[in-house]
Amino acid sequence: MSVLEQLGGDAQAGTTSGARASARTRTFSWHDPAATAAEGLKLSGLEYIRAIAAGELPPPPIAELLGFQIVEADEGRAVFAIEPAEWMYNPIGMIHGGVAATLLDSCMGCAVHTSLAPGVGYTTTDLQVRYIRAMGERTGRVLAEGRLVHGGRRTATAEGRVFGEADGKLIAHGTTGCTIFA
């Protein structure tokens, strides 16, 4: 069985005629991110992330685009979930590595955010990702867990893991550095 077939793809569908004949579309919508961010400035980072998780505030556009959700948030920790889908595939028939990188950037950044006071923000300064195994539709639901490693006044670091919910197998892991600004 090919890697493509193991991940849920069809090795025979990769022909030019098959690819051209099966065009698909996908649409999504989102809320004004500036309005959501303005509301978030009134809340602690943990309150803000939990409000998004509870549906009290809309998720950011990137979450709507990729279809991931915050499923847990505690002080210094954030967990996201996503269902791998065909539209996320790269040219060789598996989920594009940018999906795992985005999940890691999001869960680690939100882990940092949960430690911040109202009105304090952050931005990613660096992101390192290590890929362990490929994702496909057959992988099933995937979780991304970020944990705060260091939370200072000016900088913070976090680590994260992306893994299959059903089997716990590690897909990717990473670290991030963030600049804190008030």
Set out the residue ranges of the language-model regions.
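Terminal targeting signals and extreme-terminal segments of soluble enzymes
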Residues: 1-182
